[in-house]
Amino acid sequence: MNLLIVAIGGGIGAIARYLVGQWMMKRFPDPPFPIAMLVVNLLGSFGLGAFFGLYYHELFAASYDDIGYLFGGIGFFGAFTTYSTFSVEAVLLIREREWKKLFSYVLLSIVGSIAAFLLGFYGTSSW
């Protein structure tokens, strides 16, 4: 049953990632760096932080048997965000020797995702 809950959340998260990515690519057809995946990962980090803040009111209090965590934390946000695509896009920038774009993309992705998670968590944990 737990696998089904994760799969449903993951399916919805993957579809949401695709839709946000497509929307971003239409709005920014020639971005300075991979902005669609950056936005997806920042939104996902904020969303996961808000999910923990609203649902658990403390960091990482979830259990692997908790249906909400299985669906939202592992399923939806696990599929919505993507470290593997971030890595591919970073390697493409390395291959193209786009050092400034690479540095900006990596810094914004890593620091931005952590900041977005904390903003989501602390912005909602007292509700």
UniProtKB/Swiss-Prot annotation:
Keywords: Cell membrane, Ion channel, Ion transport, Membrane, Metal-binding, Sodium, Transmembrane, Transmembrane helix, Transport. The keyword Protein biosynthesis does not apply. The chain crosses the membrane at residues 3-23, 35-55, 74-94, 102-122. It is found in: Cell membrane. InterPro entries: FluC. One of its GO terms (cellular component) is plasma membrane. Na(+) binds at G78, T81. It catalyses: fluoride(in) = fluoride(out). It is a multi-pass membrane protein. One of its GO terms (molecular function) is metal ion binding. Na(+) is not transported, but it plays an essential structural role and its presence is essential for fluoride channel function. The keyword 4Fe-4S does not apply. One of its GO terms (biological process) is cellular detoxification of fluoride. Belongs to the fluoride channel Fluc/FEX (TC 1.A.43) family. Fluoride-specific ion channel. Important for reducing fluoride concentration in the cell, thus reducing its toxicity. NCBIfam families: crcB. PANTHER family: FLUORIDE EXPORT PROTEIN 1-RELATED (PTHR28259:SF1). This is Fluoride-specific ion channel FluC 1. It comes from Halalkalibacterium halodurans (strain ATCC BAA-125 / DSM 18197 / FERM 7344 / JCM 9153 / C-125).
